[in-house]
Amino acid sequence: MATKTELSPTARESKNAQDMQVDETLIPRKVPSLCSARYGIALVLHFCNFTTIAQNVIMNITMVAMVNSTSPQSQLNDSSEVLPVDSFGGLSKAPKSLPAKSSILGGQFAIWEKWGPPQERSRLCSIALSGMLLGCFTAILIGGFISETLGWPFVFYIFGGVGCVCCLLWFVVIYDDPVSYPWISTSEKEYIISSLKQQVGSSKQPLPIKAMLRSLPIWSICLGCFSHQWLVSTMVVYIPTYISSVYHVNIRDNGLLSALPFIVAWVIGMVGGYLADFLLTKKFRLITVRKIATILGSLPSSALIVSLPYLNSGYITATALLTLSCGLSTLCQSGIYINVLDIAPRYSSFLMGASRGFSSIAPVIVPTVSGFLLSQDPEFGWRNVFFLLFAVNLLGLLFYLIFGEADVQEWAKERKLTRL
């Protein structure tokens, strides 16, 4: 008969190592980050995310120019609504693009399973994911300018060419693991492999679907991502409409004002990754760091949005608060969004896709619920929308704070069959 036994009998004795605190007896001396292979891969992923989101954003920007250049003049029948956004602030321009972007994120997490040392995982993931925000900023800032000066086809030529360069770079630079990487130093290879040997095994095992469905830490990540995406969706879709209706200023007509929140978010997101890893070097438990990052990325952002209806100042102050709120929200990149790499590194790519799919329900619900509240109460509708945002965000955050973990789960550990 066959029974399942733990591959590592000392796993329970290394709880601090499971909390991702650096154990100097297991991990060799850290190698420099500058010109290292792992940070080179993070920059390539940053460029890939930049390209993916920028290509989605320019589709919405150039669509207006395409229609205006091919259709006769007619009576205006436009709307101030825009399409939903994704978890990191990227505009979702077409439903068919959502599965593609989910696979891109899941694939990236599969790379970090083999390339991301636990004590550097926050900054590596933040560098990679921040490419989405830089892509939004660049496309919004120059997409309209290129369309007006060179013509809308050149927008596709330029960003399509960037995509081709990105593909070539991916094929040359990206490898499955450090062992097969031809340009990595021996010291860095040993450092990465030793850092991950307690988490990632070599054998392939089936997905423990039932255990995942019963896992409260997994559900805390899913609900936390859902509530945070509710925040981001409302922030990007409805805040510009709010400023337009209250202050009679259309910030979407100003490329710099529209792009400013994304460049601020880009900076704060990467700084947050470095701060998270810095706290780990100060012997903070990993779950503490993840929860601090999630709190800072959720509560201040939602509180700033709730305060908007009570401001007596002009639209500049409101836009500044919106920019700050958008920037702070990306701190969750170092918190809840990479938590699956901590609790189940072997299945992180699948769980990233699953949690992202679950959280994508929020952008579908937000326009319907918010539109209903605004139509029912024109006077206090905006306050109701923002208080609902705060309530949903707070509930998801509390659930994550109560049930979130950072230890590798029992069902995610490597096991082997022994014959008796």
Swiss-Prot record:
Keywords: Cell membrane, Endoplasmic reticulum, Glycoprotein, Ion transport, Membrane, Sodium, Sodium transport, Symport, Transmembrane, Transmembrane helix, Transport. Residues 1-21 are annotated as: Disordered. The chain crosses the membrane at residues 126-146, 154-174, 218-238, 256-276, 292-314, 319-341, 357-377, 385-405. GO terms for cellular component: apical plasma membrane; brush border membrane; cytoplasm; endoplasmic reticulum membrane; perinuclear region of cytoplasm; plasma membrane. PROSITE patterns: MFS (PS50850). Pfam families: MFS_1. Glycans are attached at residues 49, 60, 68, 77. InterPro entries: MFS, MFS_dom, MFS_Na/Anion_cotransporter, MFS_trans_sf, Na-dep_P-transpt_4_prd. The keyword Glycoprotein applies. It comes from the Eukaryota. One of its GO terms (biological process) is urate transport. Expressed in the liver and kidney. It is detected in proximal tubules in renal cortex as well as some tubules and glomeruli, with highest expression at the apical side of proximal tubules (at protein level). GO terms for molecular function: efflux transmembrane transporter activity; organic anion transmembrane transporter activity; sodium:phosphate symporter activity; toxin transmembrane transporter activity; urate transmembrane transporter activity; voltage-gated monoatomic anion channel activity; xenobiotic transmembrane transporter activity. Belongs to the major facilitator superfamily. Sodium/anion cotransporter family. This is Sodium-dependent phosphate transport protein 4. It comes from Homo sapiens.
